[in-house]
Regions:
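Flexible, gly/pro- and Lys/Arg-enriched active-site loops
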Residues: 35, 43-50, 65-68, 72-154
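A general structural signal for well-ordered alpha-helical packing
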Residues: 18, 22, 31, 53, ...
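N-terminal beta1-alpha1 ligand-phosphate binding loop
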Residues: 1-28, 34-41
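Glycine-/small-residue-rich active-site loops that bind phosphorylated ligands and cofactors
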Residues: 10-13, 63, 131
Length: 154
């Protein structure tokens, strides 16, 4: 399965954290491409530092639900805490979102594929089109069209 994941960090050494997360993904899957890092303003939440974002494309034998668990384990290994006191859209050492898994459509309590807000997030679409200019998002069409139609959240 080919999967697209977005990576984000705004605490600690974000560039090092994103590189480390990509390396960790490569240990369980094959990283096909990693975008440049993009500095973006946070969306909502409390006042916080800008994010560093990237997109990675992997080839994996994992099922989407297994890949989600791997992504969450990588987040935890980099200091991410998930609990009731976690601030939605708050600062974090690492955030990994599954954006696309082949052309699958998944809507379960644990996982929604494609990511339900990917089509409106410039910080996902811009790095993604850099490494896959012909990319499409199931249900939304070509990434290039989404970027042209704007306005997008940084």
């Amino acid at each position: 399965m080919r999967a697209v994941l977005s990576l984000g960090s705004n605490l600690g050494n974000s560039a090092e954290i994103l590189s480390s997360a990509s390396e960790a993904l490569n240990e369980v899957s094959e990283v096909i491409a990693l975008s440049s890092f993009y500095q973006t303003r946070p969306i909502g939440g409390p006042p916080q530092p800008d994010f560093l974002n990237a997109v990675v494309i992997i080839e994996t034998n994992l099922e989407p639900e297994e890949l989600l668990l791997v992504a969450q384990a990588i987040e935890s290994a980099h200091g991410r805490e998930r609990n009731d006191s976690t601030v939605k859209w708050g600062p974090r050492f690492l955030d990994i979102d599954l954006i696309k898994c082949d052309e699958m459509l998944i809507n379960s309590p644990e996982l929604t594929i494609p990511h339900p807000r990917a089509h409106e997030r410039g910080f996902v679409l811009q790095p993604w089109i850099e490494i896959d200019p012909t990319a499409t998002l199931p249900g939304f069409g070509p990434i290039s069209d989404l970027l042209e139609s704007g306005p997008l959240t940084e």
